[in-house]
Amino acid sequence: MANSSPVYDWFQERLEIQDIADDFSTKYVPPHVNIFYCLGGITLVCFLIQFATGFAMTFYYKPTVAEAYSSVQYLMTDVSFGWLIRSVHRWSASMMVLMLILHVFRVYLTGGFKRPRELTWVTGVTMAVITVSFGVTGYSLPWDQVGYWAVKIVSGVPAAIPVVGDFMVELLRGGESVGQSTLTRFYSLHTFVMPWLLAVFMLMHFLMIRKQGISGPL
């Protein structure tokens, strides 16, 4: 590149960033692609908003049955723009689920799950399950009446599974009944385990799309 800066030359010599930029900027976009093909990207944006606002709330949230509710109230009433951060987190969560559903329908209706993109579809469905699980675990964290009874009902569902049902219930609750161990496990799942899982499957999803390209029209 003519008249490039020393900083650019330093990175170019080591990482060949121009080749990376050319690869992204010259990627062919099929003529049949329309606005509905942006639904997956919008879902990603919602996830990034979720990550940023969720990270901000961890500075104030206290994952204990005695202080969880009061810490959420403190965030909403006393922290500067805390109400906005939590509201954006909730709104983007709803938007993420909506965009995900529409994205799945778009891919299904346009046949984007067919050979050779079966694994892309599998990773997408896996991410859909993780996203719904985000909603279940996050719903309980304020530890109000709605959150408590939601956890009690959801964690009791596996009891209907033969042989391993009771073990799964105890694994989710951290004991025989819903309590501090349950909240701790749901908090850990919501803020650490699931974000990492989703990030890994997102990377796999994007790499496969990058390799195979966008599916053709029906």
Swiss-Prot record:
GO MF, any single term: electron transporter, transferring electrons within cytochrome b6/f complex of photosystem II activity
Subcellular location: Cellular thylakoid membrane
GO biological process: photosynthesis; respiratory electron transport chain
Keyword terms: Electron transport, Heme, Iron, Membrane, Metal-binding, Photosynthesis, Thylakoid, Transmembrane, Transmembrane helix, Transport
Source taxon at top rank: Bacteria
Named cofactor requirement(s): heme b; heme c
Broad class of the protein's primary localization: membrane
Protein residues bound to heme b 1: H103, H205
Cofactor note: Binds 2 heme b groups non-covalently with two histidine residues as axial ligands.
Keyword Protease on entry: no
Topology with respect to the bilayer: Multi-pass membrane protein
Transmembrane intervals: 35-55, 93-113, 119-139, 189-209
CDD domains associated with the record: Cytochrome_b_N
Binding site for heme b 2: H89, H190
Keyword Metal-binding among UniProt keywords: yes
Note: Heme 1 (or BH or b566) is high-potential and absorbs at about 566 nm, and heme 2 (or BL or b562) is low-potential and absorbs at about 562 nm.
Subunit-structure text: The 4 large subunits of the cytochrome b6-f complex are cytochrome b6, subunit IV (17 kDa polypeptide, PetD), cytochrome f and the Rieske protein, while the 4 small subunits are PetG, PetL, PetM and PetN. The complex functions as a dimer.
Similarity section: Belongs to the cytochrome b family. PetB subfamily.
NCBIfam families in alphabetical order: PRK03735.1 (NF002990)
Annotated function: Component of the cytochrome b6-f complex, which mediates electron transfer between photosystem II (PSII) and photosystem I (PSI), cyclic electron flow around PSI, and state transitions.
Name the UniProt record assigns to this protein: Cytochrome b6
Taxonomic source organism: Synechococcus sp. (strain CC9311)
